[in-house]
Amino acid sequence: MLSWAITFLIIAIVAAVLGFGGIAGTATGIAKILFVVFLVMFIASFFFGRRGRG
């Protein structure tokens, strides 16, 4: 699950770079939302994944 969160976080960062660069101006808002959502998912996966192994 952690690998999925990292994958989607990278996708959100790429979308943000493209959106902020002016290539897709309307994608800026979507990229911001995706970045926050997947950052939260990454942090949650990191902590819950570590707790399950102990």
From Swiss-Prot:
It is a multi-pass membrane protein. InterPro entries: DUF1328. The keyword Membrane applies. Pfam families: DUF1328. It comes from the Bacteria. It is found in: Cell membrane. The keyword Hydrolase does not apply. GO terms for cellular component: plasma membrane. Keywords: Cell membrane, Membrane, Transmembrane, Transmembrane helix. The chain crosses the membrane at residues 4-24, 29-49. Its main location: membrane. Belongs to the UPF0391 family. This is UPF0391 membrane protein PFLU_0090. It comes from Pseudomonas fluorescens (strain SBW25).
